[in-house]
């Protein structure tokens, strides 16, 4: 089967592999998969099995400006890929490039699967602080997203909450949750990494791994650390990852210094994704401090799968879909006082949790997409 993927990200330079990287690299072992390259990130180029087609005329780093300025060129490149490579099915998750994808696919009568990996109106607005700008972005992206959904043959999405949200807008979606590379993410000994990071062997390590952006309230975690250290002087915080488009990481570093805990907060910056399990290994308690209330009801973060596959206990804000999936390894907090209390309890009873993530492997998720593609095309 010949597949065209239109990803939400710079497919070969984005520092954090998305669900599309994990699923379509697996599909590319048995299908011909093409992807246009939106050169909006400046990270190290990653290897890929996909056929990459340059789709950037104006290499602007601002996502809004990049996708707006390059929109006509994106359409031409996507149209040419569909025509020249006899594409059987198009799948993607993008706002402006999603519209280009749909219009080009319909021109050649190629079926479209729209994979909505988050609620774009809110995620697009999250990068902006000005309320008027946020509202303008949210309303504009909602209109474009609805156009894209209206003209897709099948809609897939990542969480039961997002299925319900879409139903409220009049759309039926098929659920394919995020997953985890169970060959890569597994329990590991964290002793060597503690030494490398300057963390004491007996430290109680709270940890976070992922994009360091404002939708994760890491500032509140740092503000709680002085009180936690009064109760547990061996407590330290490990933050693994970098900011994507904002200065949030630098703000957190300044906050830690202002609170006098800079020596107990370890920032690694962005790390290679394949090294991530090694950085999770020294964590005694893994954090998911998801903040925006409009996201909580539709979220099912990759972190849940990755932390769980590594056998780690999780402390999270209340994320309904994650809690529905269950697991004794999950504890919940709603405010700073509850956060400190949960850390206090868990610091006294640290331990490894069962993994049980095999059914959520990316290979299983790739098979689920494959079944949809075969249903729409009649091809294997």
Task: Please identify what each model-predicted range represents.
Residues 1-44, 85, 228, 319:
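N-terminal subdomain of nucleotide-sugar transferases
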Residues 4-6, 156, 200-225, 238:
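Conserved donor-binding/catalytic core segment of Leloir-type glycosyltransferases
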Residues 14, 216, 272-279, 286-308, ...:
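Nucleotide-sugar-dependent
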Residues 22-23, 76-80, 99, 103-107, ...:
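Membrane-proximal helix-turn-helix segments that form the acceptor-binding/catalytic region
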Residues 161, 179:
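Carbohydrate-associated surface elements
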Residues 186-199:
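A short helix/loop element that forms part of the nucleotide-sugar donor recognition site in Leloir-type
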Residues 240-241, 249-275:
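Nucleotide-activated donor-binding/catalytic signature segment of Leloir-type glycosyltransferases, i.e.
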Residues 328-337, 343-348:
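Conserved acidic donor-binding segment of nucleotide-sugar-dependent glycosyltransferases
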């Amino acid at each position: 089967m010949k597949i065209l993927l239109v990803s939400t990200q710079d497919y070969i330079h984005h520092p954090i592999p998305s669900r599309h990287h994990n699923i379509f690299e697996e599909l590319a072992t048995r299908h011909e998969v093409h992807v246009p390259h939106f050169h909006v990130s400046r990270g190290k180029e990653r290897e890929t099995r996909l056929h990459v087609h340059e789709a950037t005329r104006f290499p602007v780093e601002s996502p809004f400006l990049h996708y707006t300025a390059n929109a006509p060129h994106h359409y031409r490149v996507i149209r040419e890929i569909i025509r020249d490579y006899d594409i059987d099915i198009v799948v993607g998750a993008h706002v402006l490039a999603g519209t280009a994808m749909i219009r080009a696919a319909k021109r050649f009568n190629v079926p479209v699967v729209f994979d909505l990996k988050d609620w774009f109106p809110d995620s697009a607005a999250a990068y902006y602080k000005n309320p008027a700008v946020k509202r303008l972005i949210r309303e504009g992206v909602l209109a474009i997203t609805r156009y894209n959904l209206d003209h897709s043959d099948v809609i897939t999405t990542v969480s039961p909450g997002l299925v319900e949200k879409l139903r409220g807008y009049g759309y039926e979606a098929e659920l394919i949750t995020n997953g985890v590379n169970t060959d890569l993410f597994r329990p590991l000994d964290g002793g060597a990494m503690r030494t490398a990071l300057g963390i004491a062997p007996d430290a109680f390590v709270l940890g976070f791994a992922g994009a360091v952006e404002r939708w994760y309230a890491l500032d509140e975690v740092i503000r709680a650390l002085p009180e936690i250290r009064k109760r547990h002087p061996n407590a330290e915080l490990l933050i693994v990852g970098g900011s994507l488009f904002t200065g949030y990481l630098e703000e957190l570093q300044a906050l830690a210094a202002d609170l006098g805990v800079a020596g107990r907060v370890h920032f690694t910056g962005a790390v290679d994704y394949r090294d991530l399990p090694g950085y999770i290994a020294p964590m005694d308690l893994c954090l998911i401090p998801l903040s925006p209330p409009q996201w909580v009801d539709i979220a099912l973060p990759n972190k849940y799968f990755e932390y769980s596959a590594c056998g780690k206990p999780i402390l999270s804000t209340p994320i309904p879909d994650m809690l529905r999936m269950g697991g004794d390894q999950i504890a919940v907090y709603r405010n700073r006082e509850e956060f400190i209390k949960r850390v206090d309890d868990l610091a006294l009873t640290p331990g490894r949790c069962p993994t049980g993530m095999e059914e959520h492997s990316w290979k299983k998720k790739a098979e689920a997409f494959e079944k949809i593609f075969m249903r729409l095309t009649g091809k294997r």
